[in-house]
Amino acid sequence: MLTYKNILIAVDGSHEAEWAFNKAVDVAKRNDAKLTIVNIIDSRTYSSYEVYDAQFTEKSRSFSEELLKGYQEVATRAGVTNVETRLEFGSPKAIIPKKLASELGVDLIMCGTSGLNAVERFIVGSVSEAIVRHAPCDVLVVRTEEIPEDFQPEVATPEFRKQYS
């Protein structure tokens, strides 16, 4: 029987990512696997600022650290016994499949589909698409078009996101 022992889940604070996170917790529990929860602060977002804004960077870092802490608590409470978090800066399209997958020795990467529309996906491509194309391991992309209407995030709640907007 195929089992996964080292799972990476990419989260960004969206409903889609939290939906995928919940599924990653289930897969990690069923396989008694290590779960690494990753958030990438996309450094490309800084390019729109003419002057590097330290306050923006600190707010992004605080958001990511609290997000990862919340997800780690949820995974541990759900019964995942080996949970780690990683915060990185750069392009998620490169860091997740090309750097972290090998560096952490993961055998499964899980992620949600992006919130991009068809035009945005055509122009910039999606993170999940880049992961599928470049990852050296299995990838499970959680389809998020059918998130139940009553789905309520436990970590990336509207109140949580509002603190950092």
Curated annotation (Swiss-Prot):
One of its GO terms (cellular component) is cytoplasm. It is found in: Cytoplasm. It comes from the Bacteria. Its main location: cytoplasm. PANTHER family: STRESS RESPONSE PROTEIN NHAX, UNIVERSAL STRESS PROTEIN UP12. Belongs to the universal stress protein A family. Pfam families: Usp. Gene3D superfamilies: HUPs. Keywords: Cytoplasm. This is Putative universal stress protein SH1215.
